[in-house]
């Protein structure tokens, strides 16, 4: 089933995969293909109707050269697909590790990233109402 899901990406044969314990809401797997290392996400929670917005936003940020885990489109152009009856995304595996204790340099880097994020989305035709607006309160 996994090999059939991965074939349309045209990234080569499956070499290895393993689950990632650090996921918070979704099931995530490291996937090694002939073309490199990736993360496969099976979306377990959240509103499925929000997924196209998230995919489009991450694509926009990737196009702006921000280091984000964007959804890779398959050969048919579809980035949001289905595996085992769940929405699924294949993303590049980003380098790095989780920071356990942030310092001033980390905060500077986050500030710079947020500035670049705002610039990248300032003219984006993307819109999604907040889930935590006044009606939520």
Regions found by a protein language model. Name each.
Residues 9-32:
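ATP-binding glycine-rich phosphate-binding loop
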